[in-house]
Amino acid sequence: MKIIVKIPVWMLLSLFILSPTTETIYTSGLPSLTKYFSIDGCITQITSTLYFLGFAVGILSLGRLSDIYGRRPIVLLGLFIYIVSSIISIFSVNIEMLMIARFIQAFGVSVGSVIGQSMARDSYQGAELSYVYAILSPWLLFIPSLGSYIGGYIIEYSSWHYVFVFFSLIGTILLALYYKILPETNYYIDFSQSSKYFEVFNIIIKDKILWLYAFIIGAFNGIYYGFFIEAPFILIDKMKVLPSFYGKLAFLLSFSAIFGGFLGGYLIKKRQVHDKKVMSIGFIFSLCGCILFVVNAFILEFILVSNGLAISMIFVPMMIHIIGHSLLIPITLRYALEDYAKVTGTAGSIFGAIYYIVIAAVTYCVSKIHGETISNFSLLCLVSSISSVISFYYICILYKKKSIVANEK
């Protein structure tokens, strides 16, 4: 694969963080939206499910277009859609209008994920790509956690409308910046125009390893976003915590992300630990965190404790899980599409659509099990983590079979 330009890591970061930060800022206002529209919390949570579905549609289509027309013009188009939909959201008169606007918003902002990943693969290869993802990983969780902090203050001192005003301003700034300095990284634009989308699609449909990687990424991100969807109702509505204080608590999760990211970078770069072993360590952290989460959640069901202790019992397990998340996801992203170098945009869009559908499914489950306590959500986290471990075990088996077949040839 030929590299024509290496996009700076900071520019990749600015692409990657827009979507998750948009979601975490938004979820801080879910209880406020519930009261404003006089609806059940589970209905408000479905706006996030629709956001992830819109994201899946966006990456499925816009990633393909970036193979044909280049990365740069599609990024600019996506940002324009993001800005317009954010403005529409400000003037939503009912929850249905907001749901539609959120779907469109996600469609536009999906360029940050799918084309950002394509640009990363266009620019870096092999161990260098793993290292870049490991460096980016803590910031991909740190900055969205900061989003909860920002969202909490916006909600506390104004209203949910100003969340979308903020999105509009950020989108406008990024559009102007990218228009001026974003490079084109796709060397295979001409090749992509002659490639057949459905041929790639048919290959991916039969690629069991890619599907399993997509499930793992979707399940782990589903846990992460599901927490931000459910936690505001528990802390702000039930424990009567101020939105700004909730934002500060959510921000604490970022320190686990930073630790996990730097641990991953240290193990890969300094200790030369194999990627698969780093992934296994990530799964161990996740399982430990999710098991502790379930235990603590059921203790809180039957024993009355202070708010401070209850908050610790909710956040500490999630911090442990997020360390595992930071170790696991960057490496998974590197390996998932290593066989699709010449159709990175197309393959990445299909792959991304699959794992965002998984995220949407997990967040939908969160809305269906929404209740007075967090015990149902903790069980969902544990099931998702265990299912991911099983998927990883099956991936290892498939790799061994693949290696045996290759050696026989």
UniProtKB/Swiss-Prot annotation:
GO MF, one annotated term: xenobiotic transmembrane transporter activity
Source organism of this protein record: Rickettsia typhi (strain ATCC VR-144 / Wilmington)
GO CC terms in record: plasma membrane
Q: How does it sit in the membrane?
A: Multi-pass membrane protein
InterPro entries, per this entry?
Efflux_drug-R_Bcr/CmlA, MFS, MFS_dom, MFS_trans_sf, Sugar_transporter_CS
- From which residue to which does any coiled coil extend? none
GO BP terms, alphabetized? xenobiotic detoxification by transmembrane export across the plasma membrane
Q: What is the phylogenetic placement of the source species in the record?
A: Bacteria, Pseudomonadati, Pseudomonadota, Alphaproteobacteria, Rickettsiales
Which superkingdom heads the taxonomic lineage of this protein's source? Bacteria
Regions that span the bilayer: 3-23, 43-63, 73-93, 95-115, 135-155, 162-182, 209-229, 248-268, 283-303, 309-329, 346-366, 379-399
Q: What is its main location?
A: membrane
Where, subcellularly, is it found?
Cell inner membrane
Family the UniProt entry places it in: Belongs to the major facilitator superfamily. Bcr/CmlA family.
- Assigned keywords, A-Z: Cell inner membrane, Cell membrane, Membrane, Transmembrane, Transmembrane helix, Transport
Q: Which Pfam families match?
A: MFS_1
Does the keyword Transmembrane helix feature in the UniProt annotation? yes
- Name it: Uncharacterized transporter RT0591
- SUPFAM superfamilies given in the database record: MFS general substrate transporter
